Amino acid sequence: MSLRDDYVARFNDGVRTGDWSPMLELLTDDCVLEFVGIPVGPFAGRDAVGEAYRSNPPDDELVLLDAERYAWARERDRPAGELHLEERDGRIARIRVLYETFS
């Protein structure tokens, strides 16, 4: 399983359970979470990322469409944006989520 696939699986588990700790284990201590297209973040550091997900959790699971694009499970045939992960030493150092409107 790729790091990206593992991240998405753990993200989706967090959506279902509210427990984000398995997903957070994949992040470096200084990981940055950045959203583009919505007025949220950025969040710097694993603790800040964890608090962001705990205080404002997503309400739907991710579905990977290809190497970069994702959809929400509720509308799995409609691309919702792009997910970019930067890896360092086998862990995620940066998460960049692009929200886009596709026609």
Where do the language-model regions lie?
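C-terminal and inter-domain tail/linker signature
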Residues: 1-103
